[in-house]
Amino acid sequence: MVKTQRVVITPGEPAGIGPDLIVQLAQREWPVELVVCADATLLTDRAAMLGLPLTLRPYSPNSPAQPQTAGTLTLLPVALRESVTAGQLAVENGHYVVETLARACDGCLNGEFAALITGPVHKGVINDAGIPFTGHTEFFEERSQAKKVVMMLATEELRVALATTHLPLRDIADAITPALLHEVIAILHHDLRTKFGIAEPRILVCGLNPHAGEGGHMGTEEIDTIIPVLDELRAQGMKLNGPLPADTLFQPKYLDNADAVLAMYHDQGLPVLKYQGFGRGVNITLGLPFIRTSVDHGTALELAGRGKADVGSFITALNLAIKMIVNTQ
């Protein structure tokens, strides 16, 4: 890395395990400066509950970034709306969570931060606070005015991107249009090159129907939509293999010769990845004008403040963000 970069982190729901994980992250040295967008008392109280050392140093945007030393974090303060009891949701803090996301996103857009890593949020409590919120991905897409974003989850061994995300099954076939596939594959291909450093990405594409339609006998979306799009993009030089049946695609015969898989819908691709690497997975938002990674788990309210939360996914998310920063320099 040519110079030390700043990575901004949002802990997510303050009553969940996000603050625990941030404190655990701080117990090791990092080659980047970790700027945590959070309430100071929340972090110091949680560190005390866990019996771990934590020193907060103020964020100084005009000073050169410094590699993070063990036991310290750089704090970009955002005040809680209500005091926090670990494991107990407080509706007003839904506003606090969104404020942290907005500040972190804006900092990435204006060049303060090289990447953003998000901890788990509780969507229900944010909506209960009167803020329409469907998820991090949609929030950052709207705030950054990105034309289109793509959700991808990854482990060390496997990357799975989604053509559609949080849609009911009955709506998926209608949502998979030529325009959508062109856009999603273009973003996936571009970000594999620019953010992952893969010169010529090799992408496996799932069919929509069982057996990838069985030649039109189990649905015609492959013939009508997916195959024509893949043929057009192959003619442009993209290395695309598919459409392949999803029940046979996830095996070494195919995966050993691929850099990513494009699944047509959420529960087609993600169960395999989460079974293969749960606790080590990372959620990546492709198509944003900045690097964003996230943990692959929820708030785990029942574990907050008890010292039992597994920091593995957060460490993987941070390490991947650092690699992506290097690739984009």
From Swiss-Prot:
Keywords assigned by UniProt, alphabetized: Cobalt, Cytoplasm, Magnesium, Metal-binding, NAD, NADP, Oxidoreductase, Pyridoxine biosynthesis, Zinc
Record keyword DNA damage present: no
Enzyme class label: oxidoreductase
Pfam families: PdxA
Amino-acid biosynthesis listed as a keyword: no
Further information: The active site is located at the dimer interface.
Stated family: Belongs to the PdxA family.
Function: Catalyzes the NAD(P)-dependent oxidation of 4-(phosphooxy)-L-threonine (HTP) into 2-amino-3-oxo-4-(phosphooxy)butyric acid which spontaneously decarboxylates to form 3-amino-2-oxopropyl phosphate (AHAP).
Protein name: 4-hydroxythreonine-4-phosphate dehydrogenase
Species of the source: Escherichia coli (strain SMS-3-5 / SECEC)
Gene: pdxA
